[in-house]
C-alpha cells in the first residue's frame, strides 16, 4: 500500500470560494448516492465550493490540490460531495480513491501566496488573504465507493479570514460550469491542522 492508513493527519493552507448556482448547472452527482444524499437548496440554488489546498510538510503527506464540491443533505444533516479533484501526488490519489471513494486524478499544480494554476484549465490570482481567527472546522464527506455511499468525517482547526481570488477557468474545461460566475465569498484557512477519516476501531 503506497499511502497512509486512515485517518490522515494533514496541515497546510487552503483558499476556498463559494458560489450559488442553479441546480441545473451542477456537475453530475454519482447515481449511487441518490438514496443517501440530495443536493441542498438554499433559496432554490445550490452551493458549490472550489478550493486550492497546499498540504505542507509536517503531515502524513505533502502535496497540492484543486477541488470542487457540492453541499448536500442527508435528512437534516449537511454533507459534502466532491465532484472534481486533482492532486500532484500519486499516493494521495491512490489513497483518496481506495479509502474514501474520492475521485482524485493527477495534475500539475502550482500554488504560491499570489498565484494558483493547474493543468486542467484552471488558474487564480490571490490577493488580500488575512487569516486572523483560529476556528474549529468540521464536515462530513459522502462519496461513492464500491457502488455504495461512503461517509467520512473531517475535523480541523485553522486561522481563518477573508481573501480575494480571481478565478480563470476555461469554459470547456472540467470546471467550466463555474466559468464567468462570481463567487459569493472567498476565505483563507491558514495553518490548518486536519484529520481526514475515521480512527480505526479499538482492538
Segments (PLM) and residue ranges:
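N-terminal domain-onset segments
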Residues: 1-65, 75-80, 92, 180-184, ...
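Aromatic- and glycine-enriched beta-alpha-beta binding-site module
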Residues: 51-122
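Interaction-surface and assembly-scaffold signal
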Residues: 96-203
Amino acid at each position: 500500500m503506497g499511502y497512509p492508513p486512515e485517518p490522515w493527519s494533514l496541515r497546510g493552507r487552503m483558499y476556498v470560494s463559494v458560489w450559488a448556482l442553479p441546480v441545473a448547472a451542477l456537475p453530475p452527482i454519482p447515481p449511487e448516492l441518490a438514496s443517501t444524499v440530495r443536493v441542498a437548496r438554499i433559496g432554490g440554488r445550490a452551493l458549490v465550493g472550489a478550493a486550492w489546498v497546499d498540504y505542507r510538510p509536517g503531515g502524513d503527506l505533502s502535496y497540492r490540490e484543486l477541488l470542487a464540491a457540492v453541499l448536500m443533505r442527508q435528512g437534516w444533516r449537511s454533507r459534502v460531495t466532491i465532484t472534481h479533484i486533482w492532486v500532484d501526488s500519486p499516493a494521495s490519489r491512490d489513497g483518496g480513491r481506495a479509502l474514501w471513494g474520492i475521485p482524485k486524478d493527477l495534475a500539475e499544480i502550482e500554488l504560491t501566496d499570489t498565484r494558483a494554476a493547474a493543468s486542467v484549465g484552471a488558474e487564480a490570482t490571490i490577493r488580500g488573504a488575512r487569516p486572523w481567527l483560529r476556528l474549529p472546522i468540521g464536515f462530513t464527506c459522502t462519496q461513492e465507493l464500491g457502488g455504495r455511499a461512503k461517509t467520512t468525517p473531517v475535523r480541523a482547526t485553522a486561522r481563518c479570514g477573508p481573501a480575494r481570488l480571481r478565478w480563470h477557468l476555461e469554459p470547456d474545461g472540467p470546471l467550466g460550469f463555474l466559468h464567468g460566475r462570481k463567487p459569493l465569498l472567498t476565505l483563507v484557512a491558514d495553518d490548518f491542522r486536519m484529520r481526514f477519516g475515521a480512527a480505526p476501531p479499538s482492538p
